A protein has these predicted regions:
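Peri-membrane helix termini and adjoining interfacial loops of integral membrane proteins
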Residues: 201, 444-453
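Transmembrane helix-loop junctions and nearby membrane-interface residues
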Residues: 116-123, 206-212, 240-246, 268-275, ...
Length: 504
């Protein structure tokens, strides 16, 4: 396979006409305020995946969900979110990233209100599906908006670090916030809290984010490609989220996966023949975008091992309350924030993207590996905190360079699509990773119970295996980054001169 040229950070900036246009009409203070608005929107969407998990028992009791139907409170969101990321990104390229961002956040906000006011099962699940759709559209174009706001290498690296912290740390913040809202108020407020925030985001976006003509304006929407890729992704997500319940070798699961593969094959055929494809296949010849997407799949799987498996270990083995679980994640989040916001940009400007990315992933792998030895009577300070510190360090270092790598090769006319691709890789990696880890942990637990181990010890043994696999995922991502990623280093004078110093 021949790969497209991967420009350096300065080349990316020079070639970004859309970014230059946006930058010329936006002063520095307004650009940073606009970034915080984009981050607030991203945080709201990321939170919604994990914040619901804490409230599921309360939702089940209040609305009368069965164990099977309760899963659709989560799956309804994931189905539309995963299905519409690529289409949302391409629509942003065609009709304007700012316009699609506002539409996506508006849909998400109204759907959040509907979720909070829901009094029946079907109304909650339907509103969750609309939430996922709005979240997908907004997420797919947010990276493009951010890349357009910042043109200087140092500023862009710093902005990407802040954005990466929100994307990586939002999940564990959701656990804390979900615990607080559920314990002090009720489950309705985990959704209602989004409404005023969403309205504020829309108003501030109209005020702070400049209007830039769509880079691919005038292009036609590949309707057949849009239908097939969205259907393929939704079928894949459906099979994954139901795999553990229905069985991975069941007729239903295999049939849905086969249907997803067949529809995706049809999508590839369509894209190779139409004049203006939804996803130009040459995009996947861009080395850093393809590599970053592969890293994203493994890294998201490892992060889900951290968020969900650690939360289950703390709750079911160490008997933590939801609020205590949220507080347990705080040290990792604080460290992640310090690195992402203050130091990650300096590391990228000085060393490029490969070294910080590889080092961060290896630190995260070590953090997950430490959890493999967490005992059933573990102490937070001795058995959990060291892992949280390593994972915070690793995530804080890794997210900035992986996002820069993913977006660095892409022309402005396809930046929304590239953002959709990398977001899809993270989403699918998280979904597949969680399904695999949950299945492996459950199987290991059952085996240990059958051989005479106590229930708590068996649960811990299942989580230990999940942590080990998560560590392997993170280490595998580090190897891919070290061997396949093309370095996009700033020029020497930028790496060591004034621009780098301005990152702080």
């Amino acid at each position: 396979m021949s790969f497209g040229r991967s420009p350096g950070l300065t080349d990316v900036i020079a070639n970004s006409k859309e970014a230059d246009s946006m930058s010329e009409t936006t002063d520095s203070r307004t650009r940073w305020l606009a970034l915080y608005v984009l981050c607030l929107a991203s945080l709201m969407i990321v939170l919604d995946v994990t914040i619901v998990g804490v409230a599921l028992p309360s939702i089940r009791e209040d609305l009368g969900f069965s164990e099977t139907s309760l899963a659709w409170v989560v799956n309804g969101y994931l189905l539309t979110y995963g299905g519409f990321l690529l289409l949302g990104g391409r629509l942003g390229d065609l009709f304007g990233h700012r316009r699609l961002f506002i539409l996506g956040i508006s849909a998400f906000t109204v759907a959040s209100l509907a979720c909070g006011l829901a009094t029946t099962q079907w109304s909650l699940v339907a509103a969750r599906a609309v939430q996922g759709l709005g979240g997908a559209v907004a997420s797919a174009v947010s990276l493009s908006l951010m890349m357009g706001l910042f043109t200087e290498p140092a500023d862009r690296a710093k902005a990407m670090g802040i954005f990466g912290f929100v994307a990586s740390g939002g999940g564990s913040i959701g656990v804390l916030l979900g615990g607080i809202l559920t314990d002090t108020l009720n489950w309705h407020w985990i959704f209602l809290v989004n409404f005023p925030i969403g309205v504020l985001v829309v108003l501030l976006t109209l005020r702070l984010v400049p209007v830039v003509p769509a880079a691919a304006a005038g292009g036609r929407l590949d309707l057949s490609g849009a239908i097939t890729v969205t259907a393929s992704l939704m079928l894949a997500v459906y099979a994954i989220v139901n795999g553990n319940e229905k069985g991975w070798t069941s007729v239903q699961t295999l049939a849905v996966l086969a249907a997803s593969a067949a529809v995706f094959a049809a999508f590839l055929t369509i894209e190779s023949r139409v004049r203006v494809p939804l996803v130009p296949l040459r995009l996947f010849r861009l080395r850093n975008l393809s590599t970053a997407s592969g890293i994203g799949v493994l890294w998201a799987a490892a992060m889900f091992a951290w968020f969900f498996m650690t939360a289950l270990y703390l709750q079911l083995v160490l008997d933590y309350t939801p609020l205590q679980i949220g507080l347990a994640f705080l040290p990792g989040n604080v460290i992640m924030g310090i690195l992402s916001i203050g130091l990650s940009a300096k590391l990228v400007m000085r060393y490029g993207i490969k070294k910080p990315l590889t080092t961060g992933l290896l630190l995260a792998s070590a953090g997950l590996a430490l959890l493999v030895r967490a005992p059933i009577d573990g102490s937070f300070v001795v058995d959990v905190l060291p892992s949280m510190i390593l994972l915070g360090l690793g995530a804080g270092m890794a997210f900035n360079p992986v996002l820069l790598a993913a977006m660095g090769d892409v022309e402005p006319a396809e930046s929304g699509l590239a953002s959709g691709v990398v977001n899809t890789s993270f989403m699918m990696g998280g979904a597949v990773g969680l399904a695999v880890l949950a299945s492996v942990a459950a199987s290991r637990t059952n085996t240990l119970v059958d051989t005479g181990h106590g229930q708590i010890a068996a649960l811990a043994g299942g989580y230990h295996l999940a942590f080990l696999i998560g560590a392997i995922f993170a280490a595998g991502a580090a190897v891919i980054g070290a061997t396949l990623l093309r370095e996009s280093a700033p020029a020497p004078e930028e790496a060591h001169g004034a621009p780098a110093a301005e990152c702080a």
